Amino acid sequence: MGAAWAQTFSWGTCTVEVREPIRPAQRVLVLLPGWNYSRRCWCDSSRVCSLALAKGYRLILVEMGKSIYASDVFPETRADWRHYPTLRTLIDTVFPALLEKGFLWSGRSYLLGLSTGGRGVVMILAHTGRLFRAGAALSGDFDPHLDPKDRLLTGWYGPYGPRWENVDNPLSLSERLQVPLFLAHGQNDPFVPHLHSRRLYQHLQKKRPDLTVVYREVPHAGHDFTFWEQAGEWALEFFESL
């Protein structure tokens, strides 16, 4: 099922596209792309958008470019990456604008992200309380200790150091989560090891046993839309179960 209509806005450094379902929207789904993916990647490369529209979700697509959902731009951030949106762009500019226009509904909105966008889901939920009803992070990177030389992290934060550990560490920030979380990762992921999601799940089991967290680790699955389409469907089922 397609959208009844779509509108595009520019807020701060972020382009945002809103797609309305044919029937009146019942809830909102914010779709987060991975590093250097188009905001429309979910819709162009999977059935997730059409399935969500058919279920009555309003879709919000955000253009993040080469963002890693860092809290801010730092002195060490690569010059050619500085103009991309950050976590602060979303929290201080984009989400308030969406709320003001009535496109984002507190308590009836959900987050779904793939790859770096999965990291973004945890970063956003850690800073927004109960604005969102739940989140789903697919193939995300959460534990900076797994690869201290990661080129995306060093490109934003500089060499491994206190900032990785104390400022933008999704693993530790996850302890702040106030809403349910769905995690999924392929065991054959060649880009983001599945240990990222496994460690996050284990960390939350230990630190936040009160939090609803579901983790699906999938044998033979990789870092691609074959997996993300299936896991995206699971995420929608998870949201509907709450």
Each model region followed by its residue ranges:
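Non-catalytic cap/lid and distal C-terminal segments of serine-dependent acyl enzymes
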Residues: 1-242
